[in-house]
Amino acid sequence: MESEGFSATTEQYEYYDYANETGLQPCDETDWDFSYSLLPVFYMIVFVLGLSGNGVVIFTVWKAKPKRRSADTYIGNLALADLAFVVTLPLWATYTALGFHWPFGSALCKLSSYLVLLNMFASVFCLTCLSFDRYLAIVHSLSSAKLRSRSSILVSLAVIWLFSGLLALPSLILRDTRVEGNNTICDLDFSGVSSKENENFWIGGLSILTTVPGFLLPLLLMTIFYCFIGGKVTMHFQNLKKEEQKKKRLLKIIITLVVVFAICWLPFHILKTIHFLDLMGFLELSCSAQNIIVSLHPYATCLAYVNSCLNPFLYAFFDLRFRSQCFFFFGFKKVLQGHLSNTSSSLSAQTQKSEIHSLATKV
């Protein structure tokens, strides 16, 4: 039994038509009344937190340019990718609140969908490069200077944005508006590239495109990097120098970012993979199972969206250097001095003064 299709009414990545996909009898429709009210509120919360948080990260990284760590450059671009996505959330909130009616025209339908997918790819690629950077810094600290130079980092960022842009292109090309009843919906339109009978193959291909290079492969690479890093740190744990301890603290922050990213995106990709297997005939889901997936899907998507506003708060919570930079660049020097006083009461006034400057500017 083939799937009825993954309704894209709550899915900004692949807007699948839940109705009659291949002439099959549809399952009972899911009641979306609760989602119409809840999801827009949730989107706007993510928008406000993501806009302010990622804006602070970008500003802080930009201001720290003379003494910027290599990791900071990737973190700044990660924040930029998240920011590009969260600015589209008011549009999706309006779309959902209006009962999935898109009043913004075809161009914004295409652009907003493109930015969502661009964010997903750019975020995971930035995290992968962050992990690789830590691998080089800790496992090959002496021989990796050239690979971690400013020019190499800029080249890697150019590759990240180029590949992210290319992988997100199907959304820009295939997404369009169409009238359905009294609503104008923002939907994937395969009519220009495929017959109705072959649409499932296009849907399956797009599903693989988002899950394999956008989640599974980067997660595998990051796991390999951290296995090597873990072995290195364990072997030399007792003899870590001060500089190595700084690398270890930064490593904890990056691992936290990766774990949170995986937790936020895993339910989305699991549901999408189950749908893909059902669509291609590898699974036979009952109507009740399909309805469960349909009901869970918007909330799995929301969890994925949360990742775009969480990262700045993770930096602030785990990274004293980032907090200090924020206080320093936004003029909260008294707050920073008080924080240092509480955490290091034995420091002399002169040491404390130099520590403020060091935390705010040192590599």
Curated annotation (Swiss-Prot):
Name the Gene Ontology biological process terms: angiogenesis; apelin receptor signaling pathway; blood vessel development; branching involved in blood vessel morphogenesis; calcium-mediated signaling; cell differentiation; gastrulation; heart development
Lipoprotein: present as a keyword of the record?
no
> Where does it localize?
Cell membrane
Q: Which residues lie on this side of the membrane: Extracellular?
A: 1-38, 99-111, 174-200, 271-297
Q: Does the keyword Acyltransferase apply?
A: no
Q: List the disulfide bonds.
A: 27-287, 109-186
Q: Which Pfam families match?
A: 7tm_1
Cytoplasmic topological domain: 60-77, 133-152, 222-249, 319-363
Q: Quote the InterPro entries the UniProt record gives.
A: ATII_rcpt, CCR1-9-like, GPCR_Rhodpsn, GPCR_Rhodpsn_7TM
UniProt GO cellular component terms: cytoplasm; external side of plasma membrane; plasma membrane
Name of the protein this chain belongs to: Apelin receptor B
Task: Please name the source species.
Answer: Xenopus laevis
